[in-house]
């Protein structure tokens, strides 16, 4: 039985499309359908709003999907987190007009605009506010000051809120896009295997994004010093170089190491000092430990 997977539309879609593509599952989609072809007969995909993903997984109508933890918390859906993909990071924040005396807000009944009705209500009750919530459907930041005293909204940097004359007075939670599965799917042996294999592919892609492969040559007399100075995931890959003349000391060695990208600027000069030559850097597609 195929694994039924939910792909979120909106701002999350682009990163999920790229992740799936790098995992070897390219989305084929035309403008008239919400059911893309992933080129795998064991996968059935459907595109939905991220707000709906958690509840549909809990209902069991789908087996796995992608959404932010913010929408899982908002819906209260009981699902299993499989993997934090780490992108589309946002904070769910409480914001008011910059000129507002936030302490004075507790002396009156306030209007709060938000897409996150449950999260907002929980926060407001815990902090002693009297309130009425107005549900929004996007562009929440435009409601104050005319139509709301406060908003609860998601933000990546806070820049949009600042540009609309708002200040952040509280943070409810921090969210990122995650891969979730339904509890029912994980009880099914075949579907659980599919889910675990997808998670392995996603981890491999995410790990590869953080690393590059460095390939270099080194003469035999400097080989030992170079090897001792190398970082690597496990052990470097080493192969003897062909020495056409058969001279003393042989032809040296070719060495490969997978390293984190942020190590490269300092590492390449270090390798040169240790005697490496012909250093080549190239990207990786997947890294499976």
Explain the meaning of each model-derived region.
Residues 2-42, 47, 66-80, 84-91, ...:
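Small-molecule-sensing regulatory modules
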């Amino acid at each position: 039985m195929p694994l039924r997977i939910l792909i979120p539309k909106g701002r999350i879609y682009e990163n999920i499309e790229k992740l799936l593509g790098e995992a070897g599952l390219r989305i084929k989609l035309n403008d008239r359908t919400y059911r893309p072809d992933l080129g795998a007969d064991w996968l059935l995909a459907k595109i939905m709003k991220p707000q709906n993903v958690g509840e549909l997984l809990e209902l069991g109508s789908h087996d796995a999907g992608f959404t932010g933890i913010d929408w899982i918390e908002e819906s209260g859906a009981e699902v299993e987190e499989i993997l934090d993909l780490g992108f589309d990071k946002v904070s769910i924040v409480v914001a008011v007009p910059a000129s507002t005396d936030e302490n004075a807000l507790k002396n009156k009944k306030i209007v709060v605009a938000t897409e996150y009705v449950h999260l907002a209500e929980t926060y407001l009750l815990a902090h002693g506010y009297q309130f009425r919530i107005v549900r929004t459907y996007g562009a929440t930041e435009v409601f104050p000051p005319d139509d709301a005293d406060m908003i609860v909204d998601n933000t990546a940097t806070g820049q949009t809120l600042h540009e609309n004359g708002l200040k952040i007075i509280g943070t409810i939670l921090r969210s990122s896009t995650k891969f979730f599965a339904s509890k029912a799917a994980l009880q099914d042996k075949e579907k659980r295997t599919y889910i675990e294999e997808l998670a392995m592919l996603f981890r491999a892609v995410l790990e590869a994004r953080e690393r590059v492969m460095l390939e270099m040559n080194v003469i035999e007399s400097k080989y030992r010093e170079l090897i001792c100075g190398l970082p690597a995931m496990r052990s470097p890959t080493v192969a003897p170089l062909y020495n056409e003349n058969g001279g003393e000391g042989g032809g040296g060695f070719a060495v490969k190491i997978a390293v984190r990208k942020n190590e490269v600027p300092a590492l390449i000069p270090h390798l040169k000092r240790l005697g490496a030559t012909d250093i080549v850097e190239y990207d990786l597609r997947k890294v499976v430990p």
